[in-house]
Amino acid sequence: MLPKSKIKVVQSLKHKKNRINSNLFLVEGIKSFDELLKSNYKIEFTIISKETLANKKHYKNLNDLYVVSSAEINKLSGLKNNKSLISVVHKKNLKKKSIDFSKLLIALDSVSDPGNLGTIIRIADWFNIKSILCSKNTVDLYNSKVIQSS
């Protein structure tokens, strides 16, 4: 059974100010979660549907795993049709560093659509562009739709 405290955490992380204050963010869906498992991000807890767990047996070894119905996942999710899983993850401390202007970088101003920012991140990775500068008016990097589309 999923504790109410975990539900509240997931619901709160749909809002930028709560992601900033808690230093946590959401990863939703199998594809994004599989990428997360390859990274060195620390997972706080994961909520997974019974159906997904039956198909992805290696997920059973994860710590802090809560198994619920697909309907419960869909109700909690910020995405349209997420019936698989939601994971709460610790942010990394992104350090501001000096910019090497001799290398290619991307500068963004007022990108408001999370899907567009995710696509730009994917393209930057494809072209091995290591620096992306975002104005304060650009959508939150840790928005779950940015995470999913990147």
Region spans (language model):
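Glycine/small-residue-rich loop that forms an oxyanion/phosphate-binding "nest" at active or ligand-binding sites
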Residues: 62-90
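Acidic/glycine-rich phosphate/pyrophosphate-binding loops and surrounding catalytic core
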Residues: 84-100, 138
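Boundary-proximal intrinsically disordered activation/regulatory segments immediately upstream
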Residues: 1-54, 138-139
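Short, aromatic/basic amphipathic alpha-helical patches
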Residues: 54-62, 145
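RNA substrate-binding interface of SAM-dependent RNA methyltransferases
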Residues: 38, 99-150
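A residue-level signal for conserved active-site and pocket-lining positions in enzyme catalytic cores
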Residues: 29, 87, 147
